[in-house]
């Protein structure tokens, strides 16, 4: 959807779950959160919220005021998400486009803030899902560190972005199995292993069958979210929603 008003076409055709980006369409069209939700108020499916990305960084070790401000914004986002009845809010543990000047200190700062946010989320009865973000030297956590994050913080859950994991060369099926019941959602999209293209499933170089097998092995409930580029035709999105359902039911 290139424009926010185009979502009516989707809402008319889709009654399943939705993930709402708080940065707006294309991540660059600021919206009034309270006004914007009115268009989704009557939607029958479950709602998940993707909290803002830009200008926020829970891991800022050089400037504590940035990480503290980011915490306050995300706390407000959790409260808003709970207010509209969302079941889950997705958060990035760091600003993935920012170089890590002090990696260990940045990890500690992010973990401390995620612990605080997890406590808020628990009180609000909303799932706080932490996504794997950042590529190569810009990634705050590697694969093993990402798994340990959820061992250290019991009040958060894991969202595995399959496309991000592919670019970083992670063992995505193994990661899914290692996380087990701590996995609450997956972002499904494809790429060429180099750029974060958000292509439809099958449009890149990801080997999907091992991922489907790993997801089918999970016995708990989790969200399967198509996170395709905004210019993907609605017909493709709906077709692939059915494809995912078929694959996971095999």
Regions found by a protein language model. Name each.
Residues 1-82, 249-250:
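N-terminal pre-domain/capping segments
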Residues 1-6, 21-35, 57-61, 65, ...:
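Acidic-and-aromatic substrate-binding clefts and catalytic sites of carbohydrate-active enzymes
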Residues 5-9, 87, 140-143, 147-157, ...:
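Histidine-acidic metal/acid-base catalytic patches
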Residues 14, 43-44, 84, 123-124, ...:
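Helix C-cap/helix->beta junction micro-motif
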Residues 16-20, 47-51, 89-91, 128-130, ...:
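Hydrophobic faces of well-ordered beta-strands that scaffold small-molecule active sites
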Residues 37-54, 111-121, 149-153, 208-213:
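Alpha-helix-loop-beta-strand connector modules within alpha/beta enzyme cores
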Residues 53-58, 95-98, 190-196:
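Conserved radical SAM core fold
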Residues 64-157:
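Active-site acidic/histidine proton-transfer and metal-coordination neighborhood
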């Amino acid at each position: 959807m290139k424009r926010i008003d185009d979502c009516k076409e989707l809402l008319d055709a889709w009654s399943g779950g939705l993930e709402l980006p708080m940065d707006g369409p294309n991540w660059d069209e600021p919206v009034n959160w309270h006004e914007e939700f009115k268009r989704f108020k009557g939607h029958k499916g479950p709602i998940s919220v993707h909290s803002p990305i830009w200008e926020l960084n829970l891991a800022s070790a050089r400037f504590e005021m940035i990480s503290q401000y980011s915490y306050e914004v995300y706390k407000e986002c959790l409260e808003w998400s709970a207010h509209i009845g969302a079941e889950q809010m997705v958060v990035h543990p760091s600003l993935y486009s920012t170089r890590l000047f002090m990696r260990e200190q940045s990890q500690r700062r992010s973990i401390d803030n995620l612990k605080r946010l997890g406590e808020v989320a628990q009180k609000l009865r909303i799932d706080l899902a932490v996504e794997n973000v950042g590529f190569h030297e810009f990634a705050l956590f590697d694969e093993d560190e990402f798994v340990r994050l959820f061992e250290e913080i019991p009040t958060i859950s894991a969202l595995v972005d399959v496309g991000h994991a592919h670019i970083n060369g992670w063992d995505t099926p193994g990661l899914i199995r290692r996380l087990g019941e701590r996995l609450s959602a997956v972002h499904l999209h494809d790429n060429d292993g180099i750029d974060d293209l958000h292509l439809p499933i099958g449009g890149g170089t990801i080997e999907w069958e091992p991922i489907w097998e790993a997801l089918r092995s999970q016995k708990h409930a989790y969200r399967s979210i198509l996170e395709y580029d905004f210019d993907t035709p609605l017909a493709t999105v709906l077709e692939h929603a059915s494809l995912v359902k078929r694959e996971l039911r095999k």
